[in-house]
Amino acid sequence: MEHLPEQYRQLFPTLQTHTMLASCSQSALAEPVSRAIQDYYDSLLYKGTNWKEAIEKTEFARNEFAKLIGAEPDEVAIVPSVSDALVSVASSLTAFGKKHVVYTDMDFPAVPHVWQAHSDYTVSVIPSIDGVLPLEQYETHISDETVLTCVPHVHYRDGYVQDIKAIAEISQRKGSLLFVDAYQSAGHIPIDVKEWGVDMLAAGTRKYLLGIPGVAFLYVRKELADALKPKASAWFGRESGFDGAYAKVARRFQTGTPAFISVYAAAAALSLLNHIGVSHIRDHVKTICADAVQYAAEKGLQLAAAQGGIQPGMVAIRDERASETAGLLKKKKVICAPRENVIRLAPHFYNTKEEMRHAIDEIAAKTIHK
């Protein structure tokens, strides 16, 4: 699908005044998503109650996310956040009789926070080597005593993409379950949980999924679900809502009433993404990022990209005062996402090559003259 930005930019009013390149943190808000949020308000303001409509919207969002990742709807749970998803997963593993968990030093900090709170597990960290995680590291650190391996699909700091299918093969061979944090990939990199052999995968909606905070999705492979008994479960995770039996498949990981306003937003956002097609989005983002990498190098900027990434969807530029630089850019209506000592430019399907170059020009002007 050619000319993606031209087709869809009018859906994003912010683009008329701002250069929005922070999809790794918060994407631009699309008018269909804004209308969905307003629909939620209006349903309460003018109808007084909206329970049936909200439940229908929840199921629609579940179906759209399942379509996005190649899953069945019953394999998807609606949860408040990726952190909540992992907390629930961590509480569900007792039946496996193993107490060793591994995660990587590229995981978002919420992942180690969860496992630090579970003193009954022995935890190991898989270290990266020169900014990459070779498959040999997984071979070394996953053992037959490992109950769960946690990995990010995309590194939040520099956009490094991992080969999840290859990691899944290693974890399965060693008898470990695999949990994938897809918050930084869902919406701009195609995901196929069945083809990859993933056991569990979670993603929130405020980044590349075009939504707002308050809702996330947890995929659980249906053949696995019955063996998982989450202690973090409540009435939305029960078969009827009012008895003690776990719901079938992934729904058992649900807790209370979801944030319906965020569900409305997610339903509209996911529908838009599925209409466009993530493979088209991937191709567009990859093209403009490749141009931006070359342009940044020409401008004398130092890139933080790791060697060996599969398909770049982010341009990370080194800057020891990244937050300060990002603040200066914000004054010029260029919105990017600083993290530690890098400035992240994270485009989406609505961005152009010219916007990426404009942001790089502004970064070069700020960093070179500091």
Swiss-Prot record:
Q: Which EC class is this protein assigned?
A: transferase
State the UniProt keywords alphabetically: Aminotransferase, Pyridoxal phosphate, Transferase
Keyword Plastid applies: no
Q: Which family does it belong to?
A: Belongs to the class-V pyridoxal-phosphate-dependent aminotransferase family.
Report what the protein is called.
Uncharacterized aminotransferase YcbU
Q: Which Pfam families match?
A: Aminotran_5 (PF00266)
Positions carrying N6-(pyridoxal phosphate)lysine are K207
Superkingdom, according to UniProt?
Bacteria
| GO MF term (any one) | transaminase activity
Q: What is its EC number?
A: 2.6.1.-
Q: What gene does this protein come from? A: ycbU
Q: Which Gene3D superfamilies match?
A: Aspartate Aminotransferase, domain 1, Type I PLP-dependent aspartate aminotransferase-like (Major domain)
Query: Needs which cofactor?
Result: pyridoxal 5'-phosphate
Q: Show the InterPro entries listed in the entry.
A: Aminotrans_V_dom, Aminotrans_V_PyrdxlP_BS, PyrdxlP-dep_Trfase, PyrdxlP-dep_Trfase_major, PyrdxlP-dep_Trfase_small
